Every structure is written in C-alpha cells, then in structure tokens.
Amino acid sequence: STLNRRSLGIGYIGLAHYLAKNGAKYDSQKAHDLVHKLTERFQFALLTASNRMAMEKGPCGYFGKTKYADGILPIDTYKKEVDELVEPQYKYDWDSLRDDIKQYGLRHSTLSAQMPSESSSVVSNATNGIEPPRGYLSIKKSKKGPLKQIVPGYQHLKNNYTLLWDMQSNKGYINVVAVMQKFFDQAISGNWSYNPEHYPDNEVPVSVMAQDFLTTYKYGWKTSYYQNTYDIKTDEIEEPPTPSTDLGELVSCILTEEEDCESCKI
C-alpha cells in the first residue's frame, strides 16, 4: 500500500516570519492575499513535480483511485465561501496541469499536509509551522536542557509579528488556514487560542467558541487540534535573567551564543 500510494505530506514552517517580513498581520487582507499566492504556487509546484516524475517513472499504483485521476484538483472542491476572503484569481495554468495529470498521472497519491513542525523549526530557527509565536522569546526543552529561541529577525521585525496571545480573536488565523486548505490535498488541523484577558471577568464566552467552530466549518476546515488558553504563565528556565535584563539584552546574548550552537552548524 505504501509503494502503491507513495503518499507525501509537505507543508510550511515559518509562516509567521514570512508574514512579518511582508508587514502583514494574520487578520489583515494583505495576509490572506499573500497566503493565497504562496499556497497556489506551493501546490502547483508539488503537483508539477509529481507529474513530471510520473512521466519519467510512471504514476503510483493507486493513482486511479484518486480524484486526481478524474482531473479533479483541490481548487475544484474547496468551500466556495473562501472566495469571501480572497478573490479566486490564479497566476498559474491549472487547466494545462490538469490535462497533464489526466494523461500521465502523479507519482504520489497525496502531496500536501500541514504538520506542527516543532522540532524542525528549532533546527531551522523558524517559527512553528503556520502558528503565530506565543512570544518573541520561547524556551523549549531539549536533551541538553532548556533551549532559548527568539523569533527570526527580532531586531527589525518585532513590531510586524502577530503574537498569539495578543490576538483579539481567532478570525485572522481561521481565515489564513481556510485559504491554505483551498489548495492542500490533505486536511489541515488548525488550532483555536483564547486569552481570557480579552473578555469580561477573564472568562471566554461559550458563544465565542461556538462561533469559531461554525466559522471554521463555513470556510472548509476539516479538523481542529488544540484549544489553547492563556494561563498567564511564561516559559520557565532554570536560571532566569535578572529583573534588570530586558529582552533586547537577552536577544543580544542569545545571538552571541548561536555562534557555538550545534543546531546552527547543521
């Protein structure tokens, strides 16, 4: 079955950094437009590469069992409500690709999926998958003890980042995932995050969570993963910095330490 399907699940790391570099907050129209263009290019490239491999080595054994074999692409089956977020305008020639896929097939039965990418983001010094960072500085556990990681480009992009617990609602994040799902051929498991400090009496209303559930369904989410709640705790480290140490000084210290970081030398 593995050889017959040759399933792949390729996704993003560092989306928050990408949006920050382009000066786009998650809840902005600019972010939705950027993600639409990025993900169209991403999925088109994956399908093109798999199609070319099929021309050379033949399609996967179970290609005939996929929707692709009938010329059906993700852009044919997405929830059309996503068009409320971004106009369905495309840069690439999907009809030509569709014809090539019907004629030659694909080497892989699936291609795109979104993973948490917790480990790979550490090695790459990238933000986790498609998630907004919880803060500029995070402390992650490793075999050698706590690992300090700052968001990429902190010194010049810090004001551009969307921080998870600063978001007033999940709307922007929900929309970003919905736009991605339009092109992905496997379900994306998104997360919902709530900061009680943004609500009266520090209590998240059930109506807000219900609305998020209905909105994700409306825009074509297939599954959800975590419901995160801000508990006012911060990352803990064995030797916390002294009260006089501000984040800028800590960042400078970390950047110096990275010169001898084994992960950065990979």
Task: Give names to the regions the model predicted.
Residues 1-266:
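Long, C-terminal-biased catalytic regions of enzyme "large/alpha" subunits
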